[in-house]
Structure formats: C-alpha cells, structure tokens
Amino acid sequence: MHYEKKLSIELKEKLISVNRVSKTVKGGRIFSFTALTVVGNNQGKVGFGYGKAREVPSAIQKAMEKARKNMIIIPLFKNTIQHSVTGLHTGSFIFMKPASEGTGIIAGGAMRSVLEVAGIQNILAKIYGSTNPINVVRATLNGLKKIRSPEMISKKRGKIITII
C-alpha cells in the first residue's frame, strides 16, 4: 500500500479532453461526461485512461485510475526515441522521428501531452488523418510500443550490439 502512494506521487498526470455525451431515453436525455487522461513518470513509462461518469470529477478520477493500470515502458535514448516509428489506430496515422538535443517536442494536439508525460524532450512528430484525441493517443501509444532498443534487438537476434 505504501509503495502505491509513493508511485502515484512521482507520476505526472495530464487531462487531454473532457466531453459531454448524452443518452436518449423515453423521458428525455441523460447527460454524462467522458474524460481522456495520460499518466507518465517522465522516464519512459506512460499510460492512458478513458473514464465516463455523471459528473466531471468522477470521470477524471476513473480515467486516471485506468491510466495508471495501463502503463507501458518505452526505451528512451538521450531524451528522445531510439528510431523513427509509425503508429496507427482507426483513422489516425502518426509518424515520430528522433530529434537532436534542443529541438523540443514538435507535435500537435493530444500527441504532445503523451510525449511530455513519457519524458521525451526532443522529437519530431506528425498526425495524418483523424485528429480525434482518443484515436491520436491510441495511435501514439501503438507507435511507442514498437520502439526497440539496440539491446532488445541484439538479444532477439542472438548477436552482439556492435554488429547491430
């Protein structure tokens, strides 16, 4: 229990979007809210959550809890990614490319938030197709999941790192 509290303190949380949605029933409409959040530790660990509730704070709380449970680890190299990568989810297609020191995060919309909480400081990124925040976040995480460090590749191939 103590470990979870310590873990949650070092995590950086970011709210991407809050949306009001409605369900039409016989007596009229029932309104509820959805929240999309990302959580990361600024050292290559990132996750996203999507929560829905009748009130905004409850939706955000649910989204944050889901984000903490769905975290992935990204192998970073000098505050950027190891190699160029693409990600796809439904209509959103993203392209990310490592950048030199001092470039900053050149990315738009929801992708910028994901990269910031992941701890990536220098990157060039572009969204093609749909810019729907949910699809962009999922496409970004799909792309980040594809990143492999030289150590991972050498281990998989059974070769030494210098050959790769």
From Swiss-Prot:
The keyword Ligase does not apply. GO terms for biological process: translation. GO terms for cellular component: small ribosomal subunit. Gene3D superfamilies: 3.30.160.20, 3.30.230.10. The keyword Ribonucleoprotein applies. Residues 11-74 form the S5 DRBM domain. Keywords: Ribonucleoprotein, Ribosomal protein, RNA-binding, rRNA-binding. It holds the Pfam family Ribosomal_S5_C. InterPro entries: Ribosomal_Su5_D2-typ_SF, Ribosomal_uS5, Ribosomal_uS5_bac-type, Ribosomal_uS5_C, Ribosomal_uS5_N, Ribosomal_uS5_N_CS, Ribsml_uS5_D2-typ_fold_subgr. GO terms for molecular function: rRNA binding; structural constituent of ribosome. HAMAP family: Ribosomal_uS5_B. PANTHER family: MITOCHONDRIAL RIBOSOMAL PROTEIN S5. With S4 and S12 plays an important role in translational accuracy. Part of the 30S ribosomal subunit. Contacts proteins S4 and S8. The N-terminal domain interacts with the head of the 30S subunit; the C-terminal domain interacts with the body and contacts protein S4. The interaction surface between S4 and S5 is involved in control of translational fidelity. Belongs to the universal ribosomal protein uS5 family. This is Small ribosomal subunit protein uS5. It comes from Buchnera aphidicola subsp. Cinara cedri (strain Cc). The lineage of its organism: Bacteria, Pseudomonadati, Pseudomonadota, Gammaproteobacteria, Enterobacterales.
